[in-house]
Design a protein with these regions (language model features):
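Active-site-proximal or metal-binding-adjacent scaffold patches in catalytic folds
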Residues: 1-99, 108-153
């Protein structure tokens, strides 16, 4: 009976861990430090207004996707930005990873809009305008186009 109580307590304690620990996600990569990049971009582009966000590497799938590649996501309700761990490689330029992180951070500050058909639009004109302000925007777009196949099967 005492043993069952201990297991129950462990389950309860586990659910209180921060989200990235619950999911087994890492902040530090082999080549890039996401927290350092987030802090740098937050200061430079957002006046340190993005507070309480966690930035983590997502889970690495065994196989790369066949048709499309998601570089990053933001889960605003939990304030978690996930970056695809396939980007933590030596051949990925730092400025490209900064661009991906900047893109996800923009989602936290530029509001979504509802379209006429009732669907949500996250890449609004305002979002796209602000995204183009990123110093390496054109270079990052070109690099993505030229290197996307490296991330697909």
């Amino acid at each position: 009976m005492a043993r069952r109580t201990i297991r129950t307590k462990r389950k309860i304690a586990r659910s209180r861990l921060p989200l990235q620990q619950q999911l087994g996600l890492d902040i530090e990569g082999r080549y890039f430090d996401l927290r350092g990049l987030f802090n740098k971009l937050n200061a430079r582009h957002f006046g340190n207004r993005l507070r309480g966000y966690k930035v983590v590497w997502g889970r690495k799938r065994r196989e790369r996707p066949k048709e499309y590649f998601i570089f990053g996501t933001i889960q605003e309700e939990d304030r978690v930005i996930r970056i695809n761990p396939w980007l933590d490689q030596r051949f990925v330029p730092l400025w490209f990873l900064e661009y991906i992180l900047y893109h996800e951070m923009l989602h936290a500050v530029v509001p979504d809009k509802m379209r006429g058909d009732g669907r949500r639009c996250v890449h609004t004109d305002e979002f796209n305008r602000r995204e183009r302000e990123f110093r390496f925007y054109k270079r990052a777009q070109r690099w993505e186009e030229e290197n996307l196949a490296r991330f697909l099967r």
